[in-house]
Regions:
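Membrane-topology and secretion signals of cell-surface/extracellular proteins
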Residues: 56-69, 79, 83-85, 132-141
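Core segments of cupin and vicinal oxygen chelate
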Residues: 5-7, 14-59, 64
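Short beta->alpha connector loops
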Residues: 41-42, 92, 114-115
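Generic structural signal for helix capping and beta-alpha/helix-loop junctions
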Residues: 43-45, 69, 117, 141
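Vicinal oxygen chelate
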Residues: 1-6, 10-19, 47-53, 72-142
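Active-site loop/turn elements of alpha/beta-hydrolase fold enzymes
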Residues: 66, 90, 112
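A short alpha-helix capping/helix-coil boundary motif
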Residues: 2-4, 27, 74-78
Length: 142
């Protein structure tokens, strides 16, 4: 057998939310992200938004029950997000925790050190009930 060819993969995480505009503002504040595109008031931003860090895609937000995408219909029919963690590494953990406090986010686990990767984490809930983890870089807590 020959060596497997390595593919270039870029994660493009998308979550369904009830209010794209509100969720976009929440995540922009939490992550220090910005919206993709020149017109932040474009009408389609009520249905879909892309959050960026520099030129890198961080998270896509899509309204429930719009544009008839499978699995993005019927928000109330089934639980969503169970077993999914939206995990973000942040350069300045203390500043990220301050943003969490300013947002008034529900904290699931207060800041703590994860002993395996030796980094700090805070686990919170976003406005749609998704679990969000903010973590410092691995080894930062040594």
């Amino acid at each position: 057998m020959g060596q497997l060819e390595r593919a270039t993969v870029r994660p493009q995480t998308l979550i369904a939310v009830r209010d794209v505009k509100a969720s976009s503002a929440w995540y922009q504040t939490l992550l220090g992200a910005h919206v993709h595109g020149a017109d932040p008031d474009h009408p389609h931003r009520l249905i879909y938004d892309r959050l960026m860090s520099g030129e890198s895609l961080v998270l896509q937000l899509h309204a429930w029950d719009e544009e008839e995408h499978p699995n993005l219909m019927g928000a109330d029919r089934a639980p969503h997000g169970h077993g999914v963690l939206l995990w973000f590494e942040v350069d300045d953990f203390d500043a990220a925790v301050e943003r969490v406090r300013r947002l008034g986010a529900r904290v699931i686990l207060e800041p703590h050190v994860n002993p395996a990767p030796q980094h700090r984490e805070i686990w919170i809930e976003d406005p749609d009930g998704y679990v969000v983890v903010l973590a410092s870089p691995d080894g930062e807590a040594r």
